[in-house]
Amino acid sequence: MVDKRESYTKEDLLASGRGELFGAKGPQLPAPSMLMMDRVVKMTETGGNFDKGYVEAELDINPELWFFGCHFIGDPVMPGCLGLDAMWQLVGFYLGWLGGEGKGRALGVGEVKFTGQVLPSAKKVTYRIHFKRIVNRRLVMGLADGEVLVDGRVIYTANDLKVGLFQDTSAF
């Protein structure tokens, strides 16, 4: 039985990465440094733009984060692909929260737009995921739209984020 709380701490997210939060068969978040959030502040089965579920999470920004030292030297910026990956991470986390089992894999995205950037001077990144559909058959899959905000301003949008949970990934 999954402990369906509305919020999760950093330690909870790290436990997910170790396979302890959703059980041995549940999806896992990545371990640091690829874990792209510090906390989940809201999870609901209703709500969001489509009233089919909503997740909101946050990442605290500081100039010492690993990617600022290498992307780019003299012009540090968080890679946009990390924000996109964070949204996929949250779709998979939500599927585990619903009780889905399997290994999470990103399956695609319909459209991504970048209209801003995350600099070392930023304070906080917020991720908002609005679920459109959950498929719970042989393949468990989530379909959602997402937004990335830096200090309250939308800088990335993604439509039709897709994540599936697989029992066996050997042929994937």
From Swiss-Prot:
Biological source species: Enterobacter sp. (strain 638)
Purpose of the protein: Necessary for the introduction of cis unsaturation into fatty acids. Catalyzes the dehydration of (3R)-3-hydroxydecanoyl-ACP to E-(2)-decenoyl-ACP and then its isomerization to Z-(3)-decenoyl-ACP. Can catalyze the dehydratase reaction for beta-hydroxyacyl-ACPs with saturated chain lengths up to 16:0, being most active on intermediate chain length.
The protein's Enzyme Commission number: 4.2.1.59, 5.3.3.14
UniProt-recorded name of the protein: 3-hydroxydecanoyl-[acyl-carrier-protein] dehydratase
Residues annotated as catalytic: 71
Cellular location(s): Cytoplasm
Keyword rRNA-binding: no
Keyword annotations from UniProtKB, A to Z: Cytoplasm, Fatty acid biosynthesis, Fatty acid metabolism, Isomerase, Lipid biosynthesis, Lipid metabolism, Lyase
GO cellular component annotations of the record: cytoplasm
Family: Belongs to the thioester dehydratase family. FabA subfamily.
Substrates-to-products reaction catalysed: a (3R)-hydroxyacyl-[ACP] = a (2E)-enoyl-[ACP] + H2O; (3R)-hydroxydecanoyl-[ACP] = (2E)-decenoyl-[ACP] + H2O; (2E)-decenoyl-[ACP] = (3Z)-decenoyl-[ACP]
Pathway as given in its UniProt record: Lipid metabolism; fatty acid biosynthesis
Quaternary state and interactors: Homodimer.
HAMAP family the UniProt entry points to: FabA (MF_00405)
Pfam families: FabA
Example GO molecular function: (3R)-hydroxyacyl-[acyl-carrier-protein] dehydratase activity
A GO BP entry: unsaturated fatty acid biosynthetic process
